[in-house]
Swiss-Prot record:
InterPro entries attached to this UniProt entry: Tachy_Neuro_lke_CS, Tachykinin_dom
Keyword flag Hydrolase: no
GO CC list: extracellular region
Described function: Tachykinins are active peptides which excite neurons, evoke behavioral responses, are potent vasodilators and secretagogues, and contract (directly or indirectly) many smooth muscles.
Full protein name: Uperolein
Keyword Transport belongs to the record: no
PROSITE patterns according to UniProt: TACHYKININ (PS00267)
Modified residues annotated as Pyrrolidone carboxylic acid in this record: Q1
Length: 11
């Protein structure tokens, strides 16, 4: 499962 931090780093 992809970690939420990776998503925030993209923003």
């Amino acid at each position: 499962q992809p970690d939420p931090n990776a998503f925030y780093g993209l923003m």
